[in-house]
Amino acid sequence: MGRSNPVSLFNPFALSTFGFSSIGWIITFAGCIATNTQNNGFPKFAWWAVVFQLLLLIVIVVLYITNTFHYHRFFLTCAIGVAFVYNSNATNNLVYDTSSAPAAASAGFIIQCIVNILWLFYFGSEPSSPIISYIDSFGSSENVMLSSKRSKSNRNAAGQSQIPLDEPYKDETMGYAERNSVSNDNSGLHENPFNTQNYTAQLSGLENASTTNRASALPEDDYPITVRGLFDYDASPDDINELSFKKGDIFRVKDTVGNWWQGKNSKGEIGMCPSNYLEVIG
């Protein structure tokens, strides 16, 4: 469960919107310089809008490269909202000027406002939203927020020691075998050592007891929460405790604590599932 799945650095939505915003910022910066040299009435506060948008672009680049959007989602959404207000105010102060320099600056501010609205909608919405899923479908089908959260889950899971699901049953089975071993030692003097009938019967009883205990230890009431798969997930072949599922599959989980949830599908298969691939529906 500690596999690394880094975010793709070629998300079309992220790259295209960042490219438009960068072009808009360059146009704005050049237009503001030209307007300031030609007109003494240039609104000074527009410079702060230019600087704030530049800082926002730098922050987005850092979060995108380090794949840490999930940690700073609310801060990023608020910062984009502030940048939208600053750019709108600067646009209002420049758009009514008929000269070319203020017109260029206001055009750059308008481009940045449009991109900021798209970012507000994308980062402020839940990744499971149908519209957001549609936007992500044009690229790697990987939402940058989900990918960041999934990487966090994988890092946490890699640093934790995991107890296999079969451990309780293994202890119980070993105890059963030890009791039978003691019994056989006491009665070995009176039985034929080459008679394998009793040994075979003990093994059959042991297997039946293990299967019965497993079924009785996992009643349906232990999985009260219904979830649905947001994306396809293939269990690691190196970890028998993971559970595979497809997008749209509905099954039940034991609880929603931590980054990995213990689930049980309709076939009765039990395993651990990454929480960021699931949506609680009941």
From Swiss-Prot:
Q: Where in the cell is it found?
A: Cell membrane
SUPFAM superfamilies tied to this protein: SH3-domain (SSF50044)
Topology Extracellular: residue spans:
34-44, 97-102
Membrane topology annotation = Multi-pass membrane protein
Entry's transmembrane regions? 13-33, 45-65, 74-96, 103-123
Q: Which UniProt keywords apply?
A: Cell membrane, Membrane, SH3 domain, Stress response, Transmembrane, Transmembrane helix
On the Cytoplasmic side, which residues? Answer: 1-12, 66-73, 124-282
Q: Which InterPro entries match?
A: SH3-like_dom_sf, SH3_domain, Sho1_SH3
Query: What positions does the domain SH3 occupy?
Result: 222-282
One Gene Ontology term, aspect cellular component: plasma membrane
**Top-level taxonomic group:** Eukaryota
UniProt function note:
Plasma membrane osmosensor that activates the high osmolarity glycerol (HOG) MAPK signaling pathway in response to high osmolarity.
Q: Quote the subunit structure annotation.
A: Forms homooligomers.
> Which family is this sequence assigned to?
Belongs to the SHO1 family.
Q: What name is this protein filed under?
A: High osmolarity signaling protein SHO1
Q: Print the organism lineage.
A: Eukaryota, Fungi, Dikarya, Ascomycota, Saccharomycotina
- Its gene name is SHO1
